C-alpha cells in the first residue's frame, strides 16, 4: 500500500480542491418560443439555434 512521505500543505490541498465547487448552468432563452434551456443544448420542443432539429 502506498504511503506518503510528506504531509500535503494547506496550499496544495486548496489547489486540488479548487475545481470541486458546483457550477450554476448557463441558461439561454430560445428566440422562437421564449423557452429557457441550457446553452448549446436543444430545447424540449426540439429547437436549436432557432431551427427545428428533431
Swiss-Prot record:
One of its GO terms (molecular function) is structural constituent of ribosome. Keywords: Ribonucleoprotein, Ribosomal protein. One of its GO terms (cellular component) is large ribosomal subunit. GO terms for biological process: translation. The keyword Ribosomal protein applies. Transmembrane segments: none annotated. It comes from the Bacteria. Pfam families: Ribosomal_L32p. HAMAP family: Ribosomal_bL32. Belongs to the bacterial ribosomal protein bL32 family. PANTHER family: 50S RIBOSOMAL PROTEIN L32 (PTHR35534), LARGE RIBOSOMAL SUBUNIT PROTEIN BL32 (PTHR35534:SF1). This is Large ribosomal subunit protein bL32.
Amino acid at each position: 500500500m502506498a504511503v506518503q512521505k510528506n504531509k500535503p500543505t494547506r496550499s496544495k490541498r486548496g489547489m486540488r480542491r479548487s475545481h470541486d465547487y458546483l457550477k450554476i448552468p448557463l441558461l439561454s432563452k430560445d428566440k422562437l418560443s421564449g423557452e429557457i434551456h441550457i446553452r448549446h443544448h436543444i430545447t424540449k420542443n426540439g429547437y436549436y439555434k432557432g431551427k427545428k432539429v428533431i
